[in-house]
């Protein structure tokens, strides 16, 4: 394993286990730090249980969903969380009911399972359920909410209550899910989702939670940032953190390099090329890239990823690309050209060994994903990229900043 990492069986999902401030300033503005832990993804759980992914059908490899509110369907295509590796914790209601959630820059709505979900839905049995009758601050709304995933439909209705995140409380409209398919959600370590995107992506134009936090004026800056610990060997180590209102200099070095968003409303930037070794192989004429905290891997169009995998000598196995483990350390660097700077991943960053596999094959943390217009075609830079580069999402200036993580 010289020079690269082994992916442990518990994977890289994160469980938020606490929050604190970086200090206690005398004024009312500050920024909050949320600590995170690791847990397994849905796909990892399926593989560990010996599930034949090929028999589940091709829809399980398509990391997309379509959101709808009432009779209106959004054109936003987002991750289906099959490979999501990071999640945290929020409280809903008075007193707070605690939920494990994915913090997703690719979506803008908040949803958790509801106590009104029938126990005929096995996935609801295995998750924490929000009980409105236990909250003194709950307000009924009732507007129908539907999330159509490639692997099944999640539906419910909108409600309003107080949500606590990172020590901040906000009054927030959120979805109470009453119907959710057993697969994949029965195996999900997370209960729901907190969208960190823009109101333009929000179904029903529901104000996103970060917008509501900003309206209170409690943060030092109109930004939030993500750090994912690259130490995959120690399950008890700090898994990472989300900072609301700033960035943590303990976890990056040097200065941030900023790239403006393509347009307001989506965390998407311009990319000027993808290099393998010293040769620019893809995106020579420019392309788009989402920065997606709800995704584990780096993804691109099928045609682009096939060309990239051919250059790396990787073979397709079901929905993954693999190489012989002894070849992993010899694979070339992959560089992403963003804002006039190259962001380089070594094989140690994008190759991992599945500890539940008896074969000496290692998986590449790069997948094919075809996203249609208007968002796509686009690349998506998920946890594989964010682990290497501390990422700041700047709402005030509509830009994303990267700095080398440490």
Swiss-Prot record:
Protein's UniProt name: Renin
Gene transcribed to yield this protein: REN
SUPFAM superfamilies noted in UniProt: Acid proteases
Propeptide residue interval(s): 24-66
Signal peptide positions on this chain: 1-23
A GO biological process held by the record: angiotensin maturation
Keyword set includes Hydrolase: yes
CDD domains, sorted: renin_like
UniProt keyword Nuclease, yes or no: no
Keywords for the protein's UniProt record, in alphabetical order: Aspartyl protease, Cleavage on pair of basic residues, Disulfide bond, Glycoprotein, Hydrolase, Membrane, Protease, Secreted, Signal, Zymogen
Compartments it resides in: Secreted; Membrane
């Amino acid at each position: 394993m010289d020079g690269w990492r082994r992916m442990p069986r518990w994977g890289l999902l994160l469980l938020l286990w606490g929050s604190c401030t970086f200090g206690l300033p005398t004024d009312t503005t500050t920024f909050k730090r949320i600590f995170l832990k690791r847990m397994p993804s849905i796909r990892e759980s399926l593989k560990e249980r010996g599930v034949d992914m090929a028999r589940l059908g091709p829809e399980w490899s398509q990391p997309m969903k379509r959101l709808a509110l009432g009779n209106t369907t959004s054109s936003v295509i987002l991750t289906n969380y099959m490979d999501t590796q990071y999640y945290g914790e929020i409280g809903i209601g008075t007193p707070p009911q605690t939920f494990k959630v994915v913090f997703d820059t690719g979506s803008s709505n908040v949803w958790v399972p509801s106590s009104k979900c029938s126990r005929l839905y096995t996935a609801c049995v295995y998750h924490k359920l929000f009980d409105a009758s236990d909250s003194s601050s709950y307000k009924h709304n009732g507007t129908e909410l539907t999330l159509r995933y490639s692997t099944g439909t999640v539906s419910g209705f909108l409600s309003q209550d107080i949500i606590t995140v990172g020590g901040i409380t906000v009054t927030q409209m959120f979805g109470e899910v009453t119907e959710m398919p057993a697969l994949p959600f029965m195996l999900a370590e997370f209960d729901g989702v907190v969208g960190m995107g823009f109101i333009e992506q929000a179904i029903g134009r529901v104000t996103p939670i970060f917008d509501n936090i900003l309206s209170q004026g409690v943060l030092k800056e109109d930004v939030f940032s993500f750090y994912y610990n690259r130490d995959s060997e120690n399950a008890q180590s700090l898994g990472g953190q989300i900072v609301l209102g700033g960035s943590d200099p303990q976890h990056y070095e040097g200065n941030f390099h900023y790239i403006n968003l393509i347009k307001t409303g989506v965390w998407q930037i311009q990319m000027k090329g993808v290099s393998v070794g010293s040769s620019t192989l893809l995106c020579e004429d420019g392309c788009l890239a989402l920065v997606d905290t709800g995704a584990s891997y780096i993804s691109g169009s099928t045609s682009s990823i096939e060309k990239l995998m051919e250059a790396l000598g990787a073979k397709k196995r079901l929905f993954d690309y693999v190489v012989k483990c002894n070849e992993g350390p010899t694979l070339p660097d992959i560089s992403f050209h963003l804002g006039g700077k190259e962001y380089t991943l070594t094989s140690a960053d994008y190759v991992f060994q599945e500890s539940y596999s008896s074969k000496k094959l290692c998986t590449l943390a790069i997948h094919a994903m075809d996203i249609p217009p208007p968002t796509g075609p686009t690349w998506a830079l998920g946890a594989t990229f964010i682990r290497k580069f501390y990422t700041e999402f700047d709402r005030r200036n509509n830009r994303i900043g990267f700095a080398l993580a440490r």
